[in-house]
Amino acid sequence: MLVLGEEWGGDVIRGMRMLARVADAAGLEMSIFPRDQHHDIMNEYLKNGEWMSIPVAVFYTKEHDYICHWIERPISAELEIAEIGESIRAENPDIDEQAFGRARRERTAARAADWQQDSVSELKELLAASIK
């Protein structure tokens, strides 16, 4: 498994341990590449064809043939993060960006464990569908 990430990325901080456990459980070697030093690799796995979102986990066969890849966070987190943002702005219409970011981090931190479980489920489904 190839993983792209950076130490400062919130999703990387939340997701790296989960990815390491997945690799360990599956008996996979995990190689980590800093995104900002490997734009050539990162450009192959842009989210929605434009965003350098991390972490990215890329799965290969033993022969190094591509199987599939997973980017950033589970779909459930994407939906909930959007809802959290809307809720914060509705509660505080004049909130500045710094306070907004702080409030969003506080609320998303409470969901991290559930999102890790959702990530594992998503990875299982993705791999099962890709290996058929």
Language model regions located:
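Thiol-based oxidoreductase modules, predominantly thioredoxin-like and allied folds used
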Residues: 2-7, 19, 27-42, 52, ...
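Conserved redox-active cysteine motifs that mediate thiol-disulfide chemistry
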Residues: 7-14
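Flexible, glycine-rich phosphate/dinucleotide-binding loops
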Residues: 10, 39, 76
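A short secondary-structure junction signal
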Residues: 14-15, 68
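Non-globular targeting/processing and membrane-anchoring segments
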Residues: 20-25, 29, 44-53, 62-132
